[in-house]
Amino acid sequence: MLVVEGLRAGYGKVQVLHGLDMRIEAGQLVTLIGSNGAGKTTTLRALSGMIRPESGRILLGGTDIAGMPSHAITRRGLAHSPEGRRVFSTLSVADNLVMGAFPRLTGSRPRGDVNADLDRMFTLFPRLSERRPQLAGTLSGGEQQMLAMARALMLNPDVLLLDEPSMGLSPRLVSEVFATIGRLKEAKITMLLVEQFAAAALEVADFGYVMENGRLAASGPARQLRDDPAVRAAYLGAAH
């Protein structure tokens, strides 16, 4: 479970988040939608320790992780798949996945069966299985996105943050990525999804939050938000 209380964060003197409150239950897929510049990516960066919150609490399994360095947050079980994919381009697909399990291999996370989880990733992402020895930098954009997601999953995270997984992808690859997210949901992976395609995000999610100018403007079950006239007009391309 991830609980956010009164989160304020920004960059230097520019405050982006103004007292954010959110809750993600175990096994739940929650989406955060909003226009560009609303503060969605900043939210994920604050949760994962990429930027330090100014105030507020971030409770991961009951422990306040606000202000911890990102590596410490990762060890506590929060994995972040950031926008832009950011794979290790000079490493193979298989080695990228092993890097995702690094906290487990060094004893800072429960080790479990890393090899079995590698096989599980290759089953979940069959295209990656076909490219195990290939350098990550030579993969297509869609394949790199799948690799970034799979690498984050190799942590065996308690919570997975996904930032714009469809960014820059063709419609066909967007469909593949969302099909994969659907399979992760079926596996009861706890996820917070930030996504530019609000309709697709609300279709797959259990619950949603709508962000405007660093504040939450609406929240509710995803189906309810999909049917809300104001949300449809603002984010789903539908008229009142």
What are these regions (language model features)?
Residues G12, M68, V93-D113, L124-P126, ...:
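ABC-type ATPase nucleotide-binding domains, specifically the catalytic core motifs of the NBD
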Residues I33-S35:
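The feature captures the beta-strand-to-loop junction immediately N-terminal to the Walker
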Residues S48:
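Helix-to-loop junction immediately C-terminal to a conserved catalytic motif
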Residues R52, D64-R85, S89, S108-L118, ...:
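ABC ATPase NBD coupling module
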Residues L135-L139, E143:
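Conserved ABC ATPase signature
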Residues A152-L153:
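ABC ATPase C-loop
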